[in-house]
Amino acid sequence: MASQAPRDFEAQALGLVPIVVETSGRGERSYDIYSRLLKERIVFMVGEVNDQTANLVVAQLLFLESENPDKDISLYINSPGGSVSAGMAIYDTMQFVKPDVSTLCMGLAASMGAFLLASGAKGKRYALPNARVMIHQPLGGARGQASDIEIQAREILYLRDRLNHLLAHHTGQDVERIARDTDRDNFMSSEDAKAYGLIDHVSTKRP
């Protein structure tokens, strides 16, 4: 039992968000680190892509557009992917807002994370040198009666075709190659992702 408390503390500490304190002539003001970076127009998408993640990212994109519709927004991605519908909410908002949305992969951009990475403004898609990118087709787990499984299968096939066409548009690859290359998990280095058209630059230092 004596070792349980340190482990609990470590688990809680991993969820802590650092606080930044800024001092000016008007006194001190504190921000959580993500709010402070939001002031610099940096949005983080970290972890699974789900409805909660999508709501937060979409809200931040819309807020930053209202603040300045002419200044770029940076979306930093470290995600294994997740829900297609949640990812498409982010994707559509990225295309909808007036500012260019620059994307940067740090760590991993897989599945829907890779799709959103490739969906950034042309010429403004980046990855760090040791980042990994993975593309594949949508996953499905159809259950229920035969008619229900048929409906779900049609929807998955539609989503696969839609995602393939969008990925072809953003990478410059033809749809047939995208379909072949996403048939199974397809991992790439940053340089491979650049050659494929998923990103435009491999960043080793901030410009």
Curated annotation (Swiss-Prot):
GO biological process: protein quality control for misfolded or incompletely synthesized proteins
Keywords tagged on the record: Cytoplasm, Hydrolase, Protease, Serine protease
InterPro entries named among the record's database cross-references: ClpP (IPR001907), ClpP/crotonase-like_dom_sf (IPR029045), ClpP/TepA (IPR023562), ClpP_His_AS (IPR033135), ClpP_Ser_AS (IPR018215)
Reaction(s) catalysed (UniProt annotation): Hydrolysis of proteins to small peptides in the presence of ATP and magnesium. alpha-casein is the usual test substrate. In the absence of ATP, only oligopeptides shorter than five residues are hydrolyzed (such as succinyl-Leu-Tyr-|-NHMec, and Leu-Tyr-Leu-|-Tyr-Trp, in which cleavage of the -Tyr-|-Leu- and -Tyr-|-Trp bonds also occurs)
Top-tier EC class: hydrolase
Active site: 111 (nucleophile), 136
Assigned GO CC terms: cytoplasm; endopeptidase Clp complex
Subcellular location: Cytoplasm
EC number: 3.4.21.92
Organism superkingdom: Bacteria
GO molecular function: ATP-dependent peptidase activity; ATPase binding; serine-type endopeptidase activity
Primary subcellular site in the record, as a coarse category: cytoplasm
Family per similarity comment: Belongs to the peptidase S14 family.
HAMAP family given in the database record: ClpP
Quaternary structure, from the entry: Fourteen ClpP subunits assemble into 2 heptameric rings which stack back to back to give a disk-like structure with a central cavity, resembling the structure of eukaryotic proteasomes.
Function: Cleaves peptides in various proteins in a process that requires ATP hydrolysis. Has a chymotrypsin-like activity. Plays a major role in the degradation of misfolded proteins.
Name under which the protein is recorded: ATP-dependent Clp protease proteolytic subunit
